[in-house]
Amino acid sequence: MDHQPRSRIHREKNARDRLIRLVNTHPDWALGFQDERWWSRFALPRLHTWSDTGDSLHLVEQSKRKDDPEPKALACYGILLRWMNADAQLHEEVWLRFVDGRPVSAITIQFLEWCCTKLEAKGKRVLAMVWDNASWHISKAVRRWLRQHNRQVKAAGHGVRILACYLPVKSPWLNPIEPKWLHAKRRTVEPNGTLSAHELADRICATFGCAHEDHLSISKEDS
């Protein structure tokens, strides 16, 4: 962060804060903090506990067997959503979609389409979305899709527009989904072996209280 002009950091943070305040005045808007995360089946977060003898206990990291056909890690798109209920109470939930592969622009677009469909069903008209400057967020394909999507929503008179707000580079503390990722990694640790990819995804979704949806993927022709 040291190499970034301080004025730019403040400007982008202020844009995020203005967007948050704006959402609070529109009951048919939703505020979304979007991010992606890799979930390893083998690497363990830093955890420790204590035995009855007072000795520190540590988890033992597992190794991938040669006959294990599943991936070492799963990529996941997530969005922390907040909106005001009819009784003026703040509502919050997390939506997740796992990926067969890695985050790319085409998958990002699929995820945003899915979010808009779900939000429209909940009566929302605008998704005010905060996210970082990952290449699959700022690519020409994603920016073009955002413009086209918003034009189509305006022309049709229904749907969910997206207002995208980009965070300063390397500023995870400005995205409140980040600590939720860390908390979930600690809660989904398997101390007695290795979870399959499906078991890991199930456990992560259960931690966030959301359904384990079909994984997002793209064809080889689109990759």
Name each region found by the language model.
Residues 107-128:
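Short, basic/hydrophobic alpha-helical segments
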Residues 35, 78, 112, 132, ...:
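Mobile genetic element proteins and their domesticated derivatives, centered on retroelements
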Residues 27-29, 161, 170, 174-223:
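C-terminal anion-handling pockets and recognition modules
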Residues 2, 36-40, 46, 81-85, ...:
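Short, solvent-exposed loop/turn segments at secondary-structure junctions
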Residues 11-114:
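Extended, low-complexity cationic-aromatic segments
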Residues 1-7:
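Short, basic alpha-helical/linker "hinge" immediately adjacent to a nucleic-acid-recognition surface
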Residues 124-138, 167, 175:
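Acidic/histidine-rich, metal-coordinating catalytic segments
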Residues 56-66, 149-179, 192-193:
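RNase H-like polynucleotidyl transferase catalytic core
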